Curated annotation (Swiss-Prot):
Belongs to the virB8 family. Keywords: Cell inner membrane, Cell membrane, Crown gall tumor, Membrane, Plasmid, Transmembrane, Transmembrane helix. This is Protein virB8. It comes from Agrobacterium fabrum (strain C58 / ATCC 33970) (Agrobacterium tumefaciens (strain C58)). NCBIfam families: PRK13865.1.
Length: 237
């Protein structure tokens, strides 16, 4: 046989020393792996606790069930800006929100169409303080003989067009409008009216009502008077 086919003899003392070195190396690696696992677990725990704390802080500062309206407007240079509070809008933008909301209230209260009567009834009721709401509902509901439901039903309608809005005092606005009575088979009859609206701004309005009342307005007093003499139309209390 050739010499390369024979294994080299290793002294027993040398072999024992080699085994000790291998065992010590493996033990050191195992300890290092355990330490690394503990560090990773600690970092993961801290990250989870941090995320939980952050989520709790956000939920406390901004309740998730709260609906916050965002107002958008176009600046003179063409850029778009936004704000979440009416009181922090530029004066002209806050006035625009108030004017639009009050006009929508008057328009739906003074107009009538059988197809949209329920929507108008609900919005006007939600916009109104308790006493104003009661007066409106007593006027509009059956069996009041002056209610447009009784007089017009599905055979006519009242159309309302805006003329002007003017602030009388803080929290009081007068709105002039044209109202046209249209009855099937008859000539339309137009008249002009003025509505005097007293209102307040509230911050505790439920989220569902903010969708149709972003300004948070509540009408506390409402009166109408006819400007022109006409045999068409009427005014509720």
């Amino acid at each position: 046989m050739k010499g390369s086919e024979y294994a080299l003899l290793v002294a027993r003392e040398t072999l024992a020393e080699h085994y000790k070195e291998v065992e010590a190396f493996q033990t050191a690696r195992a300890k290092s792996a355990r330490r690394l696992s503990k560090v990773i677990a600690a970092v993961a725990t801290i990250a989870v606790l941090g995320n939980v704390a952050q989520a709790f802080t956000i939920a406390t500062m901004v309740p998730l069930i709260r609906l916050v309206p965002v107002y958008l407007w176009i600046r003179p240079d063409g850029t778009v800006d936004s704000e979440v509070s009416v009181s922090r809008l530029p004066a002209t933008q806050e006035e625009a929100v108030v004017n639009a909301s009050l006009w929508e209230y008057v328009r739906l209260r003074e107009s009538y169409d059988a197809d949209t009567a329920q929507y108008a009834y609900d919005l006007v009721s939600n916009f109104s303080a308790p006493m104003v709401r009661q007066n409106y509902q007593q006027f509009f509901n059956y069996p009041n003989p002056t209610s447009p439901q009784v007089i017009l039903g599905k055979h006519g309608r009242l159309e309302v067009e805006h003329i002007a809005s003017n602030d009388v005092t803080p929290g009081v606005q007068q709105i002039r409008y044209k109202r046209t009575l249209i009855v099937d088979g008859k000539m339309p009859m137009a008249s002009t009216w003025t509505a005097t609206v007293r209102y307040e701004k509230v911050t505790s309005l439920p989220g569902r009502l903010r969708l149709t009342n972003p300004g948070g307005l509540v009408v506390t007093s409402y009166q109408t008077s006819e400007d022109t003499v006409s045999n068409a139309g009427h005014s509720e209390p």
